[in-house]
């Protein structure tokens, strides 16, 4: 390996950093293949991964990490690649970095976490992404002799960061019901105490509790919407139920201003299966090995009864086979 190529040039930048900044993936791969260290920083402490995160070059990000780039490496001013992507508002880059092992709860030397940076820059879509990917809203941050939670950090800055702080409250409220609460109960209690000191935050928290109560009174079979959507317990539910209850699910979602988003998954599942069923009843033949019937002679109810026993993949297979037959006939 050419040590000169691996080190910092006279202008203070490494060759790999400069090629990354240009977006020259061919040259980046060539340098990495020759053994250039992807973690060598410039004189300003920024590495190739930091600039790749800033420019949102996903292909180069993946290559750098594949060749050993430290995904949580900090700059002198405390920035990791994930913090940079949050600042730029690039959700795709955030998602890739999380896929590649970036820690959603990483605490830098200044006590800044990804959630803190999200609140500071008001990134609501990235907030949801991080919460879905394991960010801990009840994390107790330790810096020297000082400890604090995210609500304690921002409570005196409420007027400056009002909307993003309000957006975090619903996640804190439902975190009480997650399995991880057993190890985060102190952080949860400290967050709740901070929320209780602010009338606006408390108002949102009470609305959250009201919506959770509503979700316990609606459901499918013996499972409430709270269990299905908040606890994400859908393993024993027949997916045909999402079709049968689709209109009621949509109606219930319209009553949930805060937690309505938690119903998106099951409503989409219901809509998708309904579309498949509607397409499948119109096919001219049914040649799945599991079925032995004169398909065209069956009434609509009989077809739906048969289709309801099939999973989505088999229904798609039925539709595809019919489409192929039609094309062969017309061809």
Swiss-Prot record:
The keyword Cell cycle does not apply. The keyword Iron does not apply. ANK repeats lie at residues 11-40, 44-73, 77-106, 110-139. PROSITE patterns: ANK_REP_REGION (PS50297), ANK_REPEAT (PS50088). SUPFAM superfamilies: Ankyrin repeat. Keywords: ANK repeat, Repeat. Coiled coil: none annotated. PANTHER family: ANKYRIN REPEAT AND EF-HAND DOMAIN-CONTAINING PROTEIN 1 (PTHR24127:SF1). This is Putative ankyrin repeat protein FPV012. It comes from Fowlpox virus (strain NVSL) (FPV).
């Amino acid at each position: 390996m050419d040590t000169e190529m691996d080190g910092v040039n006279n202008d203070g930048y490494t060759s790999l950093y400069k090629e990354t900044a240009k977006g020259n993936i061919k040259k980046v791969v060539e340098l990495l293949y020759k053994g250039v260290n992807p973690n060598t920083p410039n004189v300003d402490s920024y590495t190739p991964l930091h600039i790749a995160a800033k420019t949102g070059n996903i292909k180069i990000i993946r290559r750098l990490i594949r060749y050993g780039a430290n995904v949580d490496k900090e700059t002198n001013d405390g920035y990791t690649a994930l913090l940079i992507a949050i600042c730029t508002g690039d959700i795709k880059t955030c998602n890739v970095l999380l896929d590649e092992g970036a820690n959603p709860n990483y605490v830098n030397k200044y006590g800044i976490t990804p959630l803190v940076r999200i609140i500071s820059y008001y990134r609501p879509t990235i907030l949801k992404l991080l919460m879905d990917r394991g960010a801990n809203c009840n994390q107790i941050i330790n810096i020297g002799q000082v400890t604090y939670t995210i609500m304690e950090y921002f409570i005196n800055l409420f007027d400056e960061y009002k909307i993003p702080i309000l957006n975090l409250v619903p996640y804190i409220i439902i975190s009480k019901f997650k399995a991880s609460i057993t190890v985060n109960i102190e952080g949860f209690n400290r967050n709740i105490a901070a929320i209780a000191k602010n009338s606006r935050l408390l108002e949102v928290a009470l609305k959250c509790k009201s919506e959770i109560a509503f979700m316990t009174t609606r459901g499918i079979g013996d499972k409430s919407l709270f269990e299905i959507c908040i606890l994400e317990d859908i393993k024993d539910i027949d997916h045909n139920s999402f079709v049968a209850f689709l209109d009621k699910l949509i109606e219930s979602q319209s009553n949930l201003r805060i937690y309505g988003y938690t119903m998106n998954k099951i409503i989409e599942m219901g809509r998708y299966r309904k579309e498949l069923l509607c397409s499948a009843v119109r096919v001219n033949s049914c040649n799945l090995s599991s079925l032995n019937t004169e398909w065209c002679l069956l009434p609509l109810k009989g077809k739906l009864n048969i289709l309801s026993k099939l999973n989505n993949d088999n229904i798609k297979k039925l539709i595809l086979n019919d489409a192929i037959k039609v094309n062969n006939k017309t061809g």
